[in-house]
């Protein structure tokens, strides 16, 4: 079993923001692979289904970014999941918009959602880093990541490619995964 976590913030004011690319991507995975709609738990939304022969749980923590580790730890502990079977999809301002990197472990690089997860389960899980870039104007990074994409249509094809090919990452074929989405 694998757990795919999409990071973001709940609420309509955060929809289609840079910081919510994790939510956006797990929604696309859910749709592409025909999972049931998400159901609401105390502090997260969850659904499950199959990708090829693998049981997959998708979650969107609804505890706000800074507390994402709480629901992730609950699910990990309940299902006794190995960190090798956890993938966290998150925005990364250090990567240019549309650039993707797959990485296991490492620091949070200042990302509060990752800091929270690290504090509850450690940092040796998989990350799908979705580049959102940095502001080109005088806005702070915090204001930028909480702003909506200026042209979401430019992001949609990449999100769809990730959804279609996520099975390769789950199989451990990160090279094929990256080659098919770039």
UniProtKB/Swiss-Prot annotation:
BP-aspect Gene Ontology terms: protein quality control for misfolded or incompletely synthesized proteins; rescue of stalled ribosome
A cellular component annotation (GO) from this entry: cytoplasm
Subcellular location: Cytoplasm
Gene Ontology MF, one: tRNA binding
A family per Pfam: Pept_tRNA_hydro
Binding annotation for tRNA: 14, 64, 66, 112
SUPFAM superfamilies noted in UniProt: Peptidyl-tRNA hydrolase-like (SSF53178)
Protein name: Peptidyl-tRNA hydrolase
Native species: Wolbachia sp. subsp. Drosophila simulans (strain wRi)
């Amino acid at each position: 079993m694998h757990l795919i976590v999409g990071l973001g913030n709940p609420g309509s004011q955060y929809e289609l923001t840079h910081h919510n690319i994790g939510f956006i991507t797990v929604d696309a995975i859910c749709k592409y692979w025909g999972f049931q709609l998400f159901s609401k738990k105390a502090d997260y939304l969850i659904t499950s289904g199959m990708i090829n022969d693998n049981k997959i749980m998708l979650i969107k923590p609804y505890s706000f970014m800074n507390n994402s580790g709480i629901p992730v730890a609950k699910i990990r502990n309940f299902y006794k999941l190995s960190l090798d079977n956890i993938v966290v999809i998150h925005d990364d301002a250090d990567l240019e918009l549309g650039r993707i990197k797959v990485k296991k472990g490492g620091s949070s690089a200042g990302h509060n959602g990752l800091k929270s997860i690290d504090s509850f389960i450690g940092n040796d899980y998989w990350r799908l880093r979705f580049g959102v870039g940095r502001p080109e104007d005088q806005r702070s990074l915090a204001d930028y990541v909480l702003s909506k994409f200026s042209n979401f249509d430019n992001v949609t094809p990449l999100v769809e490619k990730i959804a279609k090919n996520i099975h390769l990452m789950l199989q451990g074929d990160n090279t094929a995964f990256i080659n098919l989405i770039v």
